[in-house]
Amino acid sequence: MHYKKSIIGIAVTATAIIAGCQVTHQIVKSQGTAQGKHGEVQVETTFKDGHIVAIDVLKQKENKVLAGAVFKDVKQAIIDNNSIEVDGIAGATVTSKALKEAVGKSIEAAGVTLVATASAKKSEALTPAEYTYDVVIIGSGGAGFSAGLEAIAAGRSAVIIEKMPIIGGNSLISGAEMNVAGSWVQKNMGITDSKELFISDTLKGGDFKGDPEMVKTMVDNAVGAAEWLRDYVKVEFYPDQLFQFGGHSVKRALIPKGHTGAEVISKFSIKADEVGLPIHTNTKAEKLIQDQTGRIVGVEAAHNGKTITYHAKRGVVIATGGFSSNMEMRKKYNPELDERYGSTGHAGGTGDGIVMAEKIHAAAKNMGYIQSYPICSPTSGAIALIADSRFFGAVLINQKGERFVEELERRDVISHAILAQPGRYTYVLWNQDIENVAHTVEMHQGELKEFTKDGLMYKVDTLEEAAKVFNIPEDKLLSTIKDVNHYAATGKDEAFNHRSGLVDLSKGPYWILKATPSVHHTMGGLVVDTRTRVLDEQGKVIPGLFAAGEVTGLTHGTNRLGGNAYTDIIVYGRIAGQEAAK
């Protein structure tokens, strides 16, 4: 930890300090540093008469959306309570802890004794007991933002209510790659693709259990949705790079700047401010309001222990995501996915929208179809985005030093294959040549530090060293990689028929990561039509109620292909906003 101290105002002599003389109206500034999720967090704290009066963040590399909430709300709580013993932000615990530790170090550096105060309540404007909008959207992920912006564009008033203190949901913490057939990037790269092939891949990837019309609507509108993100929302995508996720026939997944959803959600937030789309955080939707005819006319929500009624003159859009973080719901619909499995999802993904809609007799379908993501942290369960090197040639190795599955297979296939290996884990191995193309280590330095600290990831110069750090039989690993290099040279993977072609791994340095599957996506959810209208248990439209994104249950079938979630949420989020605004 590094910190420094400066004193401004009345000079304090050594004698006065030793004697314990009290000096009033003294302003003290000091700095402190602590380790955040993606690098050091450095602050400068200003004290006066034993009180913290200001905290300035001098340096940080945290996720800009998560950091925004921490550096606003947690910082203010520290000032209000004159203490670092305050609650952090759910979903941003590491960043919250870093801020509090950095301020704590600055207190130590200043040598200031803070004045004890009664627990202060954060001053805030009185929250009205009710609001009225044309369209009320529940959830601030990609589907919710898309719906809200489209409602505003149609000339309607709209609001997004979000139960978490941070916007974005899983759309924020995902890689945010988006599959599109016929995108400008495919044209730049000379890749031939078609809507028909995209539809075929998606239906096959879900074992033909996905609804063909829902899939077709998603694919048909994908180009327009991506161009809307690029041109209207101002999301930056890499112009000359695409992912080919497992189950796809060609490279078709657009990659946002920074390789995470922070690029998308931050641009959504900026656009929402620009067009006057309010977002009410810490506001949990609890009940859908129906009139005498059965039409949905509003939402009852809770904020700081107070009930707030949101009247919706035209429609309510449910965009609350899935239930991967709700253990009881997971076990109810798929008992195998119990406490042994972590979750890649954010803490708020607990199925609230599904439960709320079922109470007014909305239909749900495919609830037992729950997907695991194959490459995640064995300690936290979080997805390992750094291992997206797999889409550029990284190989999967078991404890015996053998490959055991095609690296670009479907997520469910790879997950099951990993769980069948000794120890129920895999190693992901790649070299500098792959990193030069994938840039995953460069883009995910926070993960690199976290995985290295936990003993899950190493950078080594040779394959022999890679074998040694994880006690893999050296001779077997060398033999396996010799085969990989041969397959790369011939262009034919004789072992597992790698669909994109393997990459030569003869030159180091290498990165090797230990990983295991976690619950990732819930394919089941509310039954909707292609206009996103929610249907009841008799198959009839529930007037005034719409749903989009992971909360719905028809598009993906038994398994969602990588990169299809963002296509789904943006396409159907936009449709929901347009339909609700009519």
UniProtKB/Swiss-Prot annotation:
The modification FMN phosphoryl threonine is found at residue 93. A lipid is attached at residue 21 (S-diacylglycerol cysteine). It is an enzyme of class 1 (oxidoreductase). A lipid is attached at residue 21 (N-palmitoyl cysteine). Induction: By urocanate under anaerobic conditions. GO terms for molecular function: FMN binding; oxidoreductase activity. Its EC number is 1.3.99.33. One of its GO terms (cellular component) is plasma membrane. Catalyzes the two-electron reduction of urocanate to dihydrourocanate (also named imidazole propionate or deamino-histidine). The physiological electron donor is unknown; it might be the membrane-bound tetraheme cytochrome c (CymA). Enables anaerobic growth with urocanate as a sole terminal electron acceptor, and thus can provide the cells with a niche where no other bacteria can compete and survive. Is unable to reduce cinnamate and other unsaturated organic acids such as acrylic, crotonic, fumaric and orotic acids. Has no fumarate reductase or succinate dehydrogenase activity. This is Urocanate reductase. It comes from Shewanella oneidensis (strain ATCC 700550 / JCM 31522 / CIP 106686 / LMG 19005 / NCIMB 14063 / MR-1).
